[in-house]
Amino acid sequence: MSESPVDKPEHPGLTIGISGPARRSLAHRLITFALRLHGARTHFIRPGSKVDVSLLDGLVLSGGTHVHPSRYGQTPQVTARYDVRRDETDVRLLSRAEELNIPVLGICRGAQFINIFRGGSLCQNVTPLRVNTRHRPLLLPLQTVRVVSDSRLGEVMRSPVIGANRIHSQSIKKLGTHLRVVAVDNDSFVQAIENTRGQWLMGIQWHPEYLLYHGGHRRIFSHFVQAAEDRKLVRLDEPVEAGEDDGYVAQNGR
C-alpha cells in the first residue's frame, strides 16, 4: 500500500453516513475503515433510522439484500431476501442527498439502488446469461472490468482495464435518467455508473472495500471523501434549510 493514508488527520467535522442493514457485516466495517483512513468520521444508518441528512457531508449506500422488484415495476423472479424498510430508508436518504447536492457512493446493491431511484431497472439473475465470465462469486480481483477513460472512475483507477471482485447475481438493465455507464465486464454487464450532471454520484457494482490493498480501489474512497470535503466547504456559505426528514445524527454513531 504505497499510497497508504494511515497518517492522514481527520477532517474537522466531516461526517459520512453509511446506509446498511440492521446488523453490520465485515463489509460495512471495512467501508468504515476505508473512510476513516482518509480522515472522515462515519455514522451507520440502519433501516428506519431518522437522520438529518443536512448534517452529513457524504452518503454511502452499501451492499446487502436485493432491492424489492416492485421498486422497478417487476415481480420477484428469484428466491431472495428483501428488506423493504431499508428500501424505504434509502429512498429518503437519496432524495434528500440529491436536494442538498451531497456526494453519494453506491456499492453493489447501492449502485443498483441509485439506478432504480433514477427510474432504471435490474436484471434479477445474470448468472445463466454469462458467457465470457465465470458463474461463481469472486472475492479476489479476478474479474476483468473495462473502464471508460473519460470518466470520474477512469481518473480514479488510472487504467482502462482493472481487476475487480464479484459478489452479485443481479445487474443494471435499463439505465436510469442522467446516468452513464462507465465500466462493464467481459459480458458487457454494467459494473459502474456515474451522474451526468451536478451532484457527485457514483455507483460501483463490485466491492472495493475488500480490495483496500490495491491503490486504485482505495482511491475510490479517497476521491469520495475529497468530494464530500469540497461540497462541505461550499455548503458552509449557503443558507441553512430544514428538511422534512430532519431528525438527528448521533454524535457517536460510528
Say what each PLM segment does.
Residues 165-169, 173:
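A glycine-rich beta-turn/hairpin centered on an aromatic-Pro dipeptide
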Residues 179-187:
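Short, Gly/Ser/Thr-enriched beta-strand-loop segments that form substrate-interacting elements
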